[in-house]
């Protein structure tokens, strides 16, 4: 079987709260690091989430 093109990534809050989301990303279409605005329930506002590695 061939390996899939989608890899699991972790989106970590830049607010410093330690909150994170997990999602998948197609490495062929998006080789750069992802940054997206999402809601941080700890900070109770929308903040930027940056891609980090899943340990």
UniProtKB/Swiss-Prot annotation:
Bias kind Polar residues: ranges: 14-24
Region (Disordered): 1-24
Pfam families: Ribosomal_L33
Entry keywords, A to Z: Ribonucleoprotein, Ribosomal protein
Source taxon at top rank: Bacteria
InterPro entries reported in the protein's UniProt record: Ribosomal_bL33, Ribosomal_bL33_CS, Ribosomal_bL33_sf, Ribosomal_zn-bd
A GO term for molecular function: structural constituent of ribosome
Listed Basic and acidic residues bias regions: 1-11
GO cellular component, one term: cytosolic large ribosomal subunit
GO biological process entries: translation
HAMAP family xref list: Ribosomal_bL33
Sequence similarity: Belongs to the bacterial ribosomal protein bL33 family.
PANTHER family the UniProt entry points to: 54S RIBOSOMAL PROTEIN L39, MITOCHONDRIAL, LARGE RIBOSOMAL SUBUNIT PROTEIN BL33M
NCBIfam families per the UniProt record, alphabetical: PRK00595.1 (NF001860), rpmG_bact (TIGR01023)
Protein name, as recorded: Large ribosomal subunit protein bL33
Organism: Burkholderia multivorans (strain ATCC 17616 / 249)
């Amino acid at each position: 079987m061939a390996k899939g093109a989608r890899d699991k990534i972790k989106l970590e809050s830049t607010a410093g709260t330690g909150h994170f989301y997990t999602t998948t990303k197609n490495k062929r279409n998006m080789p750069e690091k992802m940054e997206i605005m999402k809601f941080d329930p700890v900070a109770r506002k929308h903040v930027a989430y940056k891609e980090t590695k899943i340990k």
